[in-house]
Amino acid sequence: MRIEGVITQSGEIQIDGYICKDDLKIATSFKLDTGFIGYDVAIPADIAQKLSLRPSRDEEFITAAGRSRFPVGDDTYLCLGSNMYKVSYMIYYNPFTLISITFLRQISEIVIIDFINNNIIIVLK
């Protein structure tokens, strides 16, 4: 199973996948974020609303704008290829879905990550 993505002109890595809850499945491009710590994914508020996510609590984060509270939870899944992973998330007000590098490192099915001509290819077992 291969998952393909791109390296943007600004040097960001994006991979395609789905966020799933119950029977709902929304396609999105995930930006790989090396500084995003504590949760597996950061989901834009509009996607969270479409999936009817039910965050379990609010948590305080320090952002460039100062301290802010964001809803967090774990009632959703991330689908990469044909594999599904339960994820913890925060909901935030940004148009980009973020995926934590720490989360990707924990996926035991990842065999190879290769970079070719501004493309990224992730091979899963």
Predicted segments with their positions:
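Pepsin/retropepsin-fold aspartyl endopeptidases
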Residues: 1-125
